[in-house]
Amino acid sequence: MAEKNNLVTSTQGIIKEAMHKLGFDDGMYELIKEPLRFLTVRIPVKMDDGTVKTFTGYRAQHNDAVGPTKGGVRFHPDVDEEVKALSMWMTLKCGIVNLPYGGGKGGIVCDPRQMSIHEVERLSRGYVRAISQIVGPTKDIPAPDVFTNSQIMAWMMDEYSQMDEFNSPGFITGKPIVLGGSQGRDRSTALGVVIAIEEAAKRRSKTIKGSRIVIQGFGNAGSFLAKFLYDQGAKIVGISDAYGALHDPEGLDIDYLLDRRDSFGTVTNLFEDTISNKELFELDCDILVPAAIANQITEDNAHDIKAEIVVEAANGPTTPEATKILTDRGVLLVPDVLASAGGVTVSYFEWVQNNTGYYWTEEEVNEKLREKLVSAFDTIYNLSQNRKIDMRLAAYIVGIKRTAEAARYRGWA
């Protein structure tokens, strides 16, 4: 819990610094430092054995000054009030790519890996019923997150449509294509990270082709990312999952590993010759991509990182102390709120398509995504260079400005 409180505290600290650089006073910071709304719900679910189990769920809505809140729903045993910090990050992501949203986030304390598909369905529907008064296509729009997918979004949409007199596909994003989902949504987060890597590489006169890349994490985002980079000619010299890491200085066969990973992204347990996560971060490489969990790069290991570029595909993988160490060493650090903004961007595209009834091809979606992210990268990189600040602070300045200005015009602070 202390680690998660540190995530909240460090996020608030950077937001405060960003707002002061923008000229906003402490009154505006007090408005923005925590979610406007935070709902805790209890969800009774009939299990397959006939017993009733009650689950705890959350939904945080950080700020809706700009527009509806937007953010994922995660099913995980460790879900708690961390969703408050995650909702703040969603506000930043939406501001960075100029979306008409504030940030939201939700979750249920559960382990779907230990539940039947019918139990997961009943839990998903129960969650929607419990939060139905504060969500909707013009209020708060959920999406997939950790251990949730398009099928769970479909159940949630169906449950909401039974309570609402109108058919509202725009209530939720990340749906199956046949129910109004967008082309390219399932790979959008990984593609967004690839675009961030491409742009960072350009700033260091590199290309993805031939670059030696290490990826921590081989789940949905990490595996899609590895495949994209591998197909572009990158040499993936290291990957990891929850059980260990694999290393080959000549490059791993990503297609071979993808064929053998299980549904939870595990593959290293099939090999005897593995290395630790600590050793993974110390590998000789050009680009390091932490795509797993928070607080992986700290002041204890930041000096050992050999990569010239670090691109954060996970939420909060680098501590503030490590950020300073890497920046002082000249490492180009692309922050999570920029690098992982691809998912919410294509979720926005899905919402727009639902509202208009006009649907785009995957090529159109990817082209619009690239346009958004390249523009955001340029803005943040140039701001960091002009003000001589790290890219994380620059991203927070860009990300929070829209919400703070909207709140000021509304007379909220």
Please give the residue ranges for each predicted region.
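Glycine-rich phosphate/diphosphate-binding loop of Rossmann-like nucleotide-binding domains
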Residues: 181-282
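Adenosine-phosphate binding glycine-rich loop
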Residues: 2-6, 200-201, 304-413
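Glycine/serine-rich phosphate-binding loop and adjoining beta1-alpha1 elements at the start
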Residues: 95-209
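Glycine-rich, N-terminal phosphate-binding loop and its surrounding beta-alpha-beta segment
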Residues: 41-51, 55-112
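Short, Gly/Pro- and small/polar-rich lid/capping loops
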Residues: 2-42
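General beta-strand structural signal in soluble alpha/beta enzymes
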Residues: 85, 139-143, 166-171, 238-241, ...
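Rossmann-like adenosine-cofactor binding region
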Residues: 244-333
